[in-house]
Amino acid sequence: MQTSETGSDTGSTVTLQTSVASQAAVPTQVVQQVPVQQQVQQVQTVQQVQHVYPAQVQYVEGSDTVYTNGAIRTTTYPYTETQMYSQNTGGNYFDTQGSSAQVTTVVSSHSMVGTGGIQMGVTGGQLISSSGGTYLIGNSMENSGHSVTHTTRASPATIEMAIETLQKSDGLSTHRSSLLNSHLQWLLDNYETAEGVSLPRSTLYNHYLRHCQEHKLDPVNAASFGKLIRSIFMGLRTRRLGTRGNSKYHYYGIRVKPDSPLNRLQEDMQYMAMRQQPMQQKQRYKPMQKVDGVADGFTGSGQQTGTSVEQTVIAQSQHHQQFLDASRALPEFGEVEISSLPDGTTFEDIKSLQSLYREHCEAILDVVVNLQFSLIEKLWQTFWRYSPSTPADGTTITESSNLSEIESRLPKAKLITLCKHESILKWMCNCDHGMYQALVEILIPDVLRPIPSALTQAIRNFAKSLEGWLSNAMNNIPQRMIQTKVAAVSAFAQTLRRYTSLNHLAQAARAVLQNTSQINQMLSDLNRVDFANVQEQASWVCQCDDNMVQRLETDFKMTLQQQSTLEQWAAWLDNVMMQALKPYEGRPSFPKAARQFLLKWSFYSSMVIRDLTLRSAASFGSFHLIRLLYDEYMFYLVEHRVAQVTGETPIAVMGEFGDLNAVSPGNLDKDEGSEVESETDEDLDDSSEPRAKREKTELSQAFPVGCMQPVLESAVQPSLLNPLHSEHIVTSTQTIRQCSATGNTYTAV
């Protein structure tokens, strides 16, 4: 190959520049212009079809001829690592023309040789090079043993090239091709590449048709849409999946983005499909101690499997499982600390109980991971030997080998005896807290991550049924054990309801935080709030440091002005919580201080909302939504922080007062070390009469209004700070107002 400096048309040297933006997986090769003097007509023809741009290099053998039809013959060289490529003989050629950064060069289909010497035919493919990298468009592999490229997202140059390709191959009009850009952008906004997942081709096209219908766009046909998909998401493979007779073509390696609105659309469509199916007859359930194949629990005699409803449920469950964290495992259960054995039991019975309960909890975890919540009731009935004489719903419960095995390992009589022992109660409660915490982290691994509405509704229905299922399954178990178990499962159900509500609020608030006009309006309305008045009113109740409150106000406005994301707001709230509770770390009063902080936080936020309401702020709705989210997320943060400090699980923290029968004023103030508690409780022993009532009686003498303020501050206010005395303040002796020459006076009746 040579570079001539002579020519009748141009006197400049035609040179080439090596590529600096190419992927290691695909060598970039581009066309070199030939000397103008030798092949004037041929060069003119080539220039009309192929273009040479800076930032690329092409190697052409000296003996190669130039084809006038635009088909460029190229040669590739095997390599093992990223480097500058050149011929074995000859030098590198550089081009100094132009400096465009957004250029695209097309190389026709050619053969490639892998590093292992395997011939790979790439047919119908195009290489697109730009400043962002090199992309392979619309290729197919004859040898799947070596992958030329990996599935990746297209660059802007790829989008432009895809439009040109479709316009040339399908003969699209200029008007229709101009619409392809919006179609391609819609694909990039709603889909992403992922390993090990697939989507039916018909589903993608139906989503596309719905998008075109909503935006009044002219859709392309299914074949052209398939080309769009492959031009944007390179390396996609097509598979035929499904049962025999019902298989469909799927794109393998692509999925709907978690935050895409198509997720909600897909869930709603599946839900409506299930609602339109006729109700099947009730199936006969076979109780299981541990579920190896969860589908077996739903199979009854005379029932046909593989129906459309079952297929819909299976597809929905598989889609939902990508939102779960199936890597969670049960924590290790501790040993039972028991000093004396109950009558009629041995240590072997206790070991059998530990082993059986561990297997029982593992079966529950397996069922939850597979989203088959209805099996939980059957598992509970099997473990607790539920045996009603006449089932209320007419279902038939069949004795199984698993139930016989459980009975042989630990008879029901011994199970009931062990359930009465305090050590067994405490051990099983700790096991439940650990298991339920693992289930929460499986179902809702991130409270801020979008969750499909159908999955959220399924979790809430599951939480609503838990207490009834467990109470019904334990109908023959001692009442003390039932109370312990129900308290734990109630905390679990409450946590699921709170977290799903928090997730729903997070998705609603995310849209507000991403709206620039709404953020500006919120900031304008917030600057009109009289925070000095808010602090003056709240300080009497909360007694917070003025400097800290002012600092929080400044930080909140600054974070709002920066248009922070939801995740950045979450980090800010966590920092506020850590600073507020830092003085109480390592002290026994930490849990109570955390609860007091929640009350103060809620009181301050309600005062701000009240001011916005009175001012008829235009952004009141946005502030109300944000306030609900931040209050709920602060509750979430405090809950986990208390669990971390106390060494317990969040479920255990919330289940501390889960048993309503055990709640009493003494339990509510059991935290020791509280300064407020020590000051208010020391006077209770001096008189049999409650302190609040005694203080109110002492005020029976008439005082002018101006003289009562110091008395109220010194006497009534400390009582308000203690929940023990709140009921006495409400039910204290009535007073009547009397008018006198000196002013209004109050006398006890």
Curated annotation (Swiss-Prot):
Biased composition (Acidic residues): 674-687
Key word Isomerase present: no
Residues spanning the membrane: none
Ranges of Basic and acidic residues composition bias in the record: 688-698
Expression sites (tissue/organ): Expressed in ciliated cells of the node and in the ciliated ependymal cells of the subcommissural organ (SCO), choroid plexuses (CP) and ventricular walls during embryonic and postnatal development. Expressed in developing and mature pancreatic endocrine cells during embryogenesis and in adults (at protein level).
Subcellular compartments: Nucleus
Phenotype caused by lack of the gene: High rate of embryonic lethality. 2 peaks of death are observed: approximately half of the embryos die around days 11 or 12 of embryonic development. Of the embryos that survive past this stage, approximately two-thirds die at birth. Surviving mice are systematically smaller. Their body weights at birth are approximately one-third lower. This growth retardation increases with age, and the body weights that adult male or female mice attain are less than half those of wild-type mice. Mice exhibit a pronounced defect in nodal cilia: cilia are present but remain markedly stunted.
Source superkingdom: Eukaryota
Keywords: Developmental protein, Differentiation, DNA-binding, Nucleus, Repressor, Transcription, Transcription regulation
Segments of the chain annotated as binding DNA: 183-258
One Gene Ontology term from the biological process aspect of the record: endocrine pancreas development
One annotated Gene Ontology cellular component of this protein: chromatin
Chief subcellular location: nucleus
ATP-binding is among the record's keywords: no
Location of region: Disordered: 663-699
Pfam families for this protein: BCD_RFX, RFX1_trans_act, RFX_DNA_binding
Family: Belongs to the RFX family.
Function: Transcription factor required for ciliogenesis and islet cell differentiation during endocrine pancreas development. Essential for the differentiation of nodal monocilia and left-right asymmetry specification during embryogenesis. Required for the biogenesis of motile cilia by governing growth and beating efficiency of motile cells. Also required for ciliated ependymal cell differentiation. Together with RFX6, participates in the differentiation of 4 of the 5 islet cell types during endocrine pancreas development, with the exception of pancreatic PP (polypeptide-producing) cells.
Protein name: Transcription factor RFX3
Gene that encodes the chain: Rfx3
